[in-house]
Amino acid sequence: MHFHLPKPLHGWREFAGEVGIIVIGVLIALGFEAIVADWQWHEKSKAAVDALRPELAANFLYASEMAIAVPCVDQQLANLEDRVASSGAELNPAPQYSEAIYARYTYRAPSREWPDQVWDAMIVEGVTSHLDPALRRRLARAYNLLSMNRATNHGTDAIAYRLQLLARPVPLDPTSRNHLIEEIEEARGDFDDMKLRSEQALRMIDLSGLAPAQRDVDAALAVSGTVKFCRAHGIALGKAEPRS
């Protein structure tokens, strides 16, 4: 039995030309679709970065505040530690302060939320994979540092509440004295860590080209409760020095 392939009406040469035209048309359509998709992601990425600016600006201000305030915070904690160590059988009470937003405290330190909602949304929506690779790496590094600061800051907030006890003339035995000193030392170490991470985050945000203007940073620091407290009590502040 013999099979015969059907012949195109106008011959194989013309048929091949028609098929070629169709293939080229499909390739052009696919290429145009890819160009449109790339343009859409470019526009979406640009809009997302614009939406990210306020969140990054807030974190940049918080990191600057933390870096500047930590030397003052450490001095306050060192004074409290000396008070615990030098007290007799009863704690010599530390001064207690209060403000509109804080009912009472024995030392003043930054307490921030270190927001990341916009960045998380960019990850969920797949926008970050379409960012410039260098920008993506820097932002990811910055937000990783900020995330660690958030967790640590929650911990120092809890210690601050517990150290309100230092404003009372509570009995001290060797165990309770050592425990209080350990709490204070933990807070000092945590603030040192946050200072380092803050300065590293400052560098990443700065390198990303998304840092706020210096005048905005200065204006925010001028109204920082911790900075104002340190200046009012003559306790030295530090500097915000971006580092690797």
Give the residues covered by each predicted segment.
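Long, hydrophobic alpha-helical segments that serve as membrane-spanning/inserting helices
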Residues: M1-R13, A34-S244
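Hydrophobic membrane-insertion alpha-helices, especially the h-region
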Residues: E18-F32
